[in-house]
Design a protein with these regions (language model features):
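Acidic/His- and Gly-rich active-site-bordering loop/insert found
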Residues: 1-110, 130-134
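Acidic/histidine-rich catalytic neighborhood of metal-dependent amide-processing enzymes
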Residues: 111-191
Length: 191
C-alpha cells in the first residue's frame, strides 16, 4: 500500500480532529480547536511564518498576505468547525476517521469545510515557496463557529473594517459575490 499523497494526509489529519461547533460556547471542546490550530501551524509552516496571523475571538483566524497593491483586497474564507455527528443512522466510515476509500477522503469536514481550509493553505504554502507575491492583498479568514451561525464571521468583518479593508472579492465555500466583474453588469452578482 502506498503512503497517501501529502496533501491528502494533511486533510486526513484535520478531519481526525473533532472540531464540533456548539450553539453555547461554554459547551465547546476548546482542546479540539486548539489542536486544529496547532495542526494547521505544523502542516503549513510557511503560511504561519510569512503571513501575519490574528486570532478572531477564541479560535478563528485572519491571515494577511500582502500583495503588490492593497486597493482590491481578496478574502478567501472557510471554516474550521463541523456539525455534530448524527448517531441515529449508521456510518459507512467513522465520521472522524479521515479514511481514504476509492480515492476519496471520508469524514466530517471533508466537504464542509476543512477541505477548503486545506486547499487554501496548501495553495498559499506552495505559492510562498515559489516566491510568489499576489497582485492584491489576500486575506484568509477561517471561522470557528460557522455551523451555528456564530460570532466569528462578524468579528472577522469588524477586524477587517478596523484595518480599513473593504474587500473587492470574497470567496466562501466555492462561490463569490463579484462587483464590476462582467461587462454590462453594474450590480453585485453571485457566481
Amino acid at each position: 500500500m502506498n503512503p497517501p499523497d501529502p496533501v491528502v494526509a494533511k486533510l486526513q489529519a484535520l478531519v481526525r480532529i473533532p472540531t464540533v461547533s456548539t450553539p453555547d460556547p461554554a459547551d465547546l471542546d476548546t482542546a479540539a480547536f486548539d489542536a486544529l490550530l496547532d495542526a494547521l501551524r505544523a502542516q503549513f509552516p510557511r503560511v504561519f511564518a510569512d503571513l501575519a496571523a490574528t486570532r478572531v475571538l477564541d479560535h478563528g483566524l485572519l491571515l494577511h498576505w500582502p500583495g503588490t497593491s492593497a486597493d482590491r483586497p481578496v478574502v478567501l474564507m472557510a471554516h474550521l468547525d463541523v456539525v455534530p455527528v448524527d448517531t441515529s443512522a449508521p456510518w459507512q466510515h467513522p465520521p472522524f476517521g479521515g479514511d481514504v476509500v476509492d480515492g476519496a477522503v471520508w469524514g466530517r469536514g471533508t466537504l464542509d469545510d476543512k477541505g477548503s481550509v486545506a486547499a487554501i493553505c496548501e495553495a498559499v504554502e506552495r505559492l510562498l515557496a515559489d516566491g510568489f507575491v499576489p497582485a492584491q492583498d489576500v486575506w484568509l479568514s477561517f471561522g470557528a463557529d460557522e455551523e451555528v451561525s456564530g460570532r466569528c464571521a462578524p468579528a472577522a468583518v469588524e477586524a477587517l473594517r478596523g484595518r480599513g479593508v473593504r474587500p473587492w472579492f470574497v470567496l466562501d465555500e466555492g462561490g463569490a459575490v463579484a462587483h464590476d466583474a462582467f461587462p454590462g453588469v453594474d450590480r453585485p452578482l453571485a457566481v
